[in-house]
Curated annotation (Swiss-Prot):
NCBIfam families: hemE (TIGR01464)
Intracellular or extracellular location(s): Plastid, Chloroplast
Lineage: Eukaryota, Viridiplantae, Streptophyta, Embryophyta, Tracheophyta
PANTHER family cross-referenced by the UniProt entry: METHYLTETRAHYDROFOLATE:HOMOCYSTEINE METHYLTRANSFERASE RELATED (PTHR21091), UROPORPHYRINOGEN DECARBOXYLASE (PTHR21091:SF169)
Site (Transition state stabilizer): 123
Domain of life: Eukaryota
Protein's name in the database: Uroporphyrinogen decarboxylase, chloroplastic
Gene from which this protein is expressed: LES22
GO MF terms held by the record: uroporphyrinogen decarboxylase activity
Amino acid sequence: MATACPPLSLPSTSLFRGRSARAGPNAGSSRPSAAAPSERRSWRRPRPDGGRAAAGERNQREEVERPPVWLMRQAGRYMKSYQLLCERYPSFRERSENVDLVVEISLQPWKVFKPDGVILFSDILTPLPGMNIPFDIVKGKGPVIYDPLRTAAAVNEVREFVPEEWVPYVGQALNILRQEVKNEAAVLGFVGAPFTLASYCVEGGSSKNFTLIKKMAFSEPAILHNLLQKFTTSMANYIKYQADNGAQAVQIFDSWATELSPADFEEFSLPYLKQIVDSVRETHPDLPLILYASGSGGLLERLPLTGVDVVSLDWTVDMAEGRKRLGSNTAVQGNVDPGVLFGSKEFITRRIYDTVQKAGNVGHVLNLGHGIKVGTPEENVAHFFEVAKGIRY
């Protein structure tokens, strides 16, 4: 089992090892500098008893040499090695549901760039067939839900997701990834948030205006709440399953929650996210949980109320402002604009340093504000990681 692997020993990835980082009073006050990669500082290990720590104890500051770094969608379509693999295996579902392919794709950026986090190659919709919701991902169109859930009867047919039965390849892949990266990086899993999953399932796929999910929310809220509860129970179980099989941190994607007004977010997203976090805390109190919601500027103060350890900011929120609005007990991730990777190397460097300086020297995971875009030059991604790993506080 992956849980037998030793804990991460790299100081730069301490935020993934234990839930102890915080913004602190000096966030944004220090300027990063370049230093030799051999420099190291001490850091605090997770609680040896594995028990629940008090809030203050969980959030004690850790001294680290630099912010850990990984990128959303770091494994994917911008890489030539991935493009060649797609020619052999054109079906996305085959690539994301075959153990060997999942491991190979997940490790492609690790072998080239050596990020501090290696995220499982998968999709937030992967659990749907196990919940009696058939779907596919069609090239040029995206996710397609064959039988959208738009009635009480349809929602009643949705069953609880049992990961061991429906996605054993996820657990197998996570175990292999832990063995492959050993103690040199954190292995990350991820899940979709209840409202985002419900949006896909009610709309029938991606949407520009979310008319159908909002129609259900505002005219038949009981039906939507029933569906959200089913996703909540299932995703909590899925996070635990991933952790039991080697995931050292899990990111929750609530991509479409920002289509809701603050009041509607508090009804249709926030309580279910909090329920997931509370459930995971009962069995996995030291598992770091990250929440990403694109375009979350209007909801920012509400995101820490979910109880997650890290809020991942998109690039439309200034990092320094985001720090202030989130408060000192929430770590941050992000938030370089993915478009920056199309700029010159000098420009990329400036943006990285600006982000790190504004984030401060504790409780920050360097990342993009969204996934890497198709067509991003690989050499610029390599430069991003080179600069990031050369930073010293």
